[in-house]
UniProtKB/Swiss-Prot annotation:
Residues 32-82, 130-141, 152-181 have a biased composition (Basic and acidic residues). Component of globulins complexes which accumulate in seeds. Belongs to the 7S seed storage protein family. This is Conglutin beta 1. Residues 483-492 have a biased composition (Acidic residues). The gene is BETA1.
Amino acid sequence: MAKMRVRLPMLILLLGVVFLLAASIGIAYGEKDFTKNPPKEREEEEHEPRQQPRPRQQEEQEREHRREEKHDGEPSRGRSQSEESQEEEHERRREHHREREQEQQPRPQRRQEEEEEEEEWQPRRQRPQSRREEREEREQEQGSSSGSQRGSGDERRQHRERRVHREEREQEQDSRSDSRRQRNPYHFSSNRFQTYYRNRNGQIRVLERFNQRTNRLENLQNYRIIEFQSKPNTLILPKHSDADFILVVLNGRATITIVNPDKRQVYNLEQGDALRLPAGTTSYILNPDDNQNLRVAKLAIPINNPGKLYDFYPSTTKDQQSYFSGFSKNTLEATFNTRYEEIERVLLGDDELQENEKQRRGQEQSHQDEGVIVRVSKKQIQELRKHAQSSSGEGKPSESGPFNLRSNKPIYSNKFGNFYEITPDINPQFQDLNISLTFTEINEGALLLPHYNSKAIFIVVVDEGEGNYELVGIRDQQRQQDEQEEEYEQGEEEVRRYSDKLSKGDVFIIPAGHPLSINASSNLRLLGFGINANENQRNFLAGSEDNVIKQLDREVKELTFPGSIEDVERLIKNQQQSYFANAQPQQQQQREKEGRRGRRGPISSILNALY
């Protein structure tokens, strides 16, 4: 029994030794197999497609990398200091090789420029957080070398799409900001004109429809403003339109020829001359000046369609076709009693026939090649102006000829400005159109006093100068028609002020009944077309003459205004000027006081400076 007790511990010890030996042999065999081909890597090789051969240097790096992963995956056996130092050394080598590969990797110049351009919208690539992510990223970079062109194309396409979206967002923001700035539906800046025609000799521009932005101007939907400009010694070719015109010469000189079935009328026009051109009348305008450009403003009243007008030219140029080309061959042959080939050569301008004719005449360029506005010679100008008449002088305008807006005395005038007006009862040309013409001159630093028109709606064109204007409207009307707009004055809930700066080429509207004042920061010239002008009355709200507030009964003034009747009377009579006044009287008085102080002499000036 005692022997059994001794042998039992020895047997257990032997079994333990055998178990340890077996475990050691198994671990060693597993390490050897794992080093040759790790299971995880075998699975990846079975599932992943065969890749292109990799550089030897990279294979060595990956072999070192797998060896380090093996040590990381083993049971905690404890590492020696030498193994840790070797691992750090391998890590430094891998980092060095990785940097060298990135430096040597070729990248197209276009790709670099796109990456620099895409910095705003593409996030920076982050450093991998683990060795596996680092290895996968390196393999993706190597695998993407074959499809770099495709990838760069996708990136360019994505970049273009994002850039387009960004531009659309910017345009939307700009339009919103423009809509916020453009709270005044009665003001049209000069850039609201659309170019109808342009060549090297001149241009024709048309202002957008007045009711395009707001329904407050529906009564003006059948009126359009057109601006015509031409260089010296040029002619706009003959045409007729399905609209009545009132044209005014703003700058330069012109000779206009009006052709009727039984006669031809020729007029010389100067600055300020106006003329009605009936619908369907064939006409052509010449700029005979050698140095000065011609600038004409026209009010168009279309006949067929509200707000739409069409020009019809008998000639064919590179910009438009002749209305003869709309007829059939048989109709043209019967109309001109000749063969169609002759009609095509002479009137319609067949390209091949024109080229032959040009070579026969030895001309480098015909008038048809220039377009609607063509250059003319000195001899042609003399012939066109031979029988021209001038505009009527002072007195009542003629029934058909031109007249000058400033030929008669101004109806309002003082040292600060002048106001001229031609009403339908004075000018028979405008009676059936129910339109008046005004021309206003406001000197620099002057103010056209607040006033309103009883019936007429005025379309005003800024001919020259700069300034600003203020127009008063009613809040209820504005809220019904545009509820999204905010009030300018939170404290004044009954009225709204529309104000804008004025510059050359701008157009603004003065609705009937809306009080208005205009301030000139430089000499300001304004051309006005009054719509529904019959029996219109202009009522001033300040000044010594034509002041409707001044005409109120004394008792009514006391009931109307919060101040005492004495203060109201004194305030109304305080403005000694009529129609036009100084825009900054208080500042002028201050300057006059300072000027009187300056005349005290040098002693007083020195004392004032010291004390």
